[in-house]
Every structure is written in structure tokens, then in C-alpha cells.
A protein has these predicted regions:
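A short beta-loop-alpha structural element at the N-terminal edge
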Residues: 10-24, 30-36
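Conserved G/P- and acidic residue-centered "switch" motifs that form tight phosphate/ATP-binding loops
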Residues: 18, 75, 105
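Conserved acetyl-CoA-binding loop-helix of GNAT-fold acetyltransferases
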Residues: 103-116
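Glycine-rich phosphate/pyrophosphate-binding loop shared by adenosine-nucleotide-utilizing enzymes
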Residues: 9, 76-80, 90
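Conserved GNAT acetyl-CoA-binding A-motif
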Residues: 89, 118-126
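Conserved beta-hairpin
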Residues: 67-84
Length: 126
């Protein structure tokens, strides 16, 4: 996928040292549901780390060829995009943004980029 999607938005391959950031993105996607449970912060943190680890291992097993990319805005990491290409299709595995970057069109730009790339090689996106 193109590493430059729109002004100020870019992608780069995720590295091992991105794990703390990727955890923060993941945890931010679970905050609303965790606000509903009667757990203290330590319990929530334990749960989030366990779930992040399970998701990471599950994605690695199910999609070993997937590209995990860090979404950048003005050079700063703001989210994660994971896409798995196969010979006959492209699977949009996951897209997640930090809360302050949601609902401003960034996700739309990213999904459109995935769709455009798939169309350019004649593959459907699922």
C-alpha cells in the first residue's frame, strides 16, 4: 500500500519497538466498554494487556503474511492498519486510531486507499 495517502497521513511498517504504542491504540478502543465494568484500574490494565496479547497472537496465526503498519499524521503515530493480501483478495484485518484522531475522515482515507489498491490489481476487499 502507498506510504503516503493524503496530506499529512502516511504509513510505515510496525516494528517491535512500536508494541507499547500499539497497545495504547488497542486499549483506547476498549475504553467505552471497560467504563461499564466495576473493576479497579489494575484489573482493567491486566485485562487489556491479556486481550492485546491474545489479539496479537491470534492475528499472527490467522494472518501470517499480513502487513501491520503504523498510521502517521504529520510524522506522529496515531493508529494501526493491518492488511492481509492473498492471491485472490485483500483482507482489511484491522484499523484503529487514537480517540483524538477518530471521526475526522482519516479512517475513510485509509479504507479508500485499500479499496483503490485492490482495484488496481483486480482483487476484492473483504
Amino acid at each position: 500500500m502507498s506510504t503516503s495517502l493524503a496530506p499529512a497521513i502516511a504509513l510505515r511498517p510496525a516494528q517491535e519497538d512500536d508494541l507499547p504504542f500499539l497497545y495504547r491504540v488497542y486499549a483506547s478502543t476498549r475504553q467505552e466498554e471497560l467504563a461499564l465494568v466495576d473493576w479497579d484500574e489494575a484489573q482493567k490494565e491486566w485485562f487489556l494487556h491479556m486481550q492485546f496479547d491474545l489479539q496479537t497472537r491470534s492475528y499472527a496465526q490467522a494472518f501470517p503474511e499480513a502487513e501491520c503498519q503504523v498510521i502517521l499524521r504529520d510524522g506522529h503515530p496515531i493508529g494501526r492498519l493491518m492488511v492481509n493480501g492473498t492471491p485472490d483478495r485483500i483482507l482489511l484485518v484491522d484499523i484503529a486510531l487514537l480517540p483524538e484522531h477518530r471521526n475526522v475522515g482519516i479512517g475513510t482515507v485509509l479504507v479508500k486507499a485499500v479499496l483503490d489498491e485492490a482495484a488496481s490489481v483486480g482483487k476484492p476487499v473483504i
